[in-house]
Amino acid sequence: MKYLLPTAAAGLLLLAAQPAMAANTGGYATTDGGEVSGAVKKTARSMKEIVDIIEAAQVDSKGKKVKGGAYPLIITYSGNEDSLIKAAEKNICGQWSKDARGVQIKEFTKGTYYPGHQWLIRQLRCLDCETLLTLWYVICALAICQAARKHGDAIRIDNSPNVWIDHNEIFAKNFECKGTPDNDTTFESAVDIKKGSTNVTVSVSVKEVGTLVNLSRLFFPFRIQRYRAFRLPVSCLP
């Protein structure tokens, strides 16, 4: 299913921390705030710059890859990509054949933190991450971000333990696009958790839709020891 997001922006907070039970939240990491020890501060004006900053943090000064990342990151986003959204709105089904656009965090466990600034993320994928706490306000648009050709999910967690997905706001409208797989670009879900992911917390997340799409898609065998209910508007209920 292709879906369109009206032009909008939202702040994102993404923090990776050591696993510790949080008494106040019931999650797998604390939300006491503060900066991770040794964190490097960066500023990004585009999604590509965010991707480049994360890639650079995975190698040392000699260019050698460091397991788990070379240092924690604090990334402040100061850009705005609303113009790309407006352009894509004119040709929704034409976005599917393009390369996916999104932020992927792969084998990075040092910690990443995005202060809440005006920004829009198209798609987030966490692959082989550990002890990752995601706490954010985010709006996703899969059709516009050209994500569905590879995997049609707004947020996808693969083979990653101790993950907390919190305070997500995902807007979606369904579009049938003839000539794509199943005529709906094989969109699966807003949140896809699979491939050995364990100890996953999903909480206080809202999905606004024009017509019903899957809220979450869970692949077994894996353990979700804490799966807290999404807060859904009435319009989303079947």
Swiss-Prot record:
Enzyme class per UniProt: lyase
Cofactor note: Binds 1 Ca(2+) ion per subunit.
Pathway: Glycan metabolism; pectin degradation; 2-dehydro-3-deoxy-D-gluconate from pectin: step 2/5
Keywords: Calcium, Lyase, Metal-binding, Signal
KW Lyase (keyword) present: yes
Catalytic reaction(s) noted: Eliminative cleavage of (1->4)-alpha-D-galacturonan to give oligosaccharides with 4-deoxy-alpha-D-galact-4-enuronosyl groups at their non-reducing ends
Residues annotated to bind Ca(2+): 153, 188, 192
Entry superkingdom: Bacteria
Cofactor: Ca(2+)
GO biological process, one term: pectin catabolic process
Gene Ontology molecular-function annotations: metal ion binding; pectate lyase activity
Leader sequence residues: 1-22
Keyword check for Metal-binding: yes
Enzyme Commission numbers on file: 4.2.2.2
Induction: By pectin.
Protein function: Involved in maceration and soft-rotting of plant tissue.
Protein family (similarity comment): Belongs to the polysaccharide lyase 1 family.
Protein name: Putative pectate lyase X
